[in-house]
């Protein structure tokens, strides 16, 4: 049984979301503040976590920041309509998705299923136990110049330096690096990283690209392999 961690100080949300997820066969562990959640997430890692942003003792952003130091666990944020900046900041920090309150339980469940499904597809493709989703589904290993991506171990290195990526970041980068010099539209990158049932807008892909660039510049300040073609999309530079 897959476990979902739910972190929110609103007990009504904890109750309603837990009921919806448990009805789909998931085990739900709940927390009412970020500090206790961090301890529990590291001690008993779930398959996915859902965070509220505004919480006592440690807010969702700080919780994500600390979690990302040790884990690439998929994370969905619950946000309010007036928290657009927080949404963008969360994506830049490595959140996989966000849902704006008020939301339907069905929408949340579908987002959870989609993220867990793409993670399972990635593992199946790595182990050769299932069909690839499409032509851009990562293979076991990819080498492009100084870039090495190992799908089975979910590792990425640049110039022999490790770069920690979330599931979404890994899939986006792989889609770009798989065909250097070929422009990938935002729609194509959405298809590579998200289930077709999940709606994401352009700013989500843009935020993930910015996050990727930032992570690579942390190990190589001269990193410039991801190019932007304004109005068209992105591409990974061809190596000599």
Curated annotation (Swiss-Prot):
What metabolic or biological pathway is this protein involved in? Glycan metabolism; exopolysaccharide biosynthesis
Write out the GO cellular component annotations: cytosol; protein-DNA complex
Principal localisation: cytoplasm
> What cofactor does this chain's UniProt record say it requires?
Mg(2+)
Positions of the Response regulatory domain: 3-116
Q: Which GO terms describe its molecular function?
A: DNA-binding transcription activator activity; metal ion binding; phosphorelay response regulator activity; transcription cis-regulatory region binding
Localization, per the record, is: Cytoplasm
Per the entry, the cofactor note is: Binds 1 Mg(2+) ion per subunit.
Protein name stated in the entry: Transcriptional regulatory protein ChvI
Biological source species: Rhizobium meliloti (strain 1021)
**Gene that encodes it:** chvI
């Amino acid at each position: 049984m897959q476990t979902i961690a739910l972190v929110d100080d609103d007990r009504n949300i904890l109750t309603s979301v837990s009921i919806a997820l448990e009805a789909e066969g998931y085990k739900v562990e709940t927390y009412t503040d970020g500090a206790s959640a961090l301890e529990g997430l590291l001690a008993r890692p779930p398959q996915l976590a859902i965070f509220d942003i505004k919480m006592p003792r440690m807010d969702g952003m700080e919780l994500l920041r600390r979690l990302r130091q040790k884990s690439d666990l998929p994370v969905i944020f619950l946000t309010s309509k007036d928290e657009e900046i927080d949404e963008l900041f969360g994506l830049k920090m490595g959140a996989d998705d966000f849902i704006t309150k008020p939301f339907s339980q069905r929408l949340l469940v579908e987002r959870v299923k989609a993220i867990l499904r793409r993670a399972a597809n990635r593992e199946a493709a790595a182990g050769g136990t299932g069909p690839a989703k499409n032509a851009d589904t990562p293979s076991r290993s990819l080498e492009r110049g100084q870039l090495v991506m190992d799908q089975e171990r979910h590792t990425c290195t640049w110039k022999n330096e490790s770069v920690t990526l979330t599931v979404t970041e890994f899939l986006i980068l792989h889609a770009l690096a798989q065909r250097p010099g070929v422009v990938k539209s935002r729609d194509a990158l959405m298809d590579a990283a998200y289930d077709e049932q999940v709606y994401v807008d352009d700013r989500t892909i843009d935020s993930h690209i910015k996050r990727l660039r930032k992570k690579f510049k942390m190990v190589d300040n001269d990193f410039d392999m991801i190019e932007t073609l304004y109005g068209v999309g992105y591409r990974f530079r061809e190596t000599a």
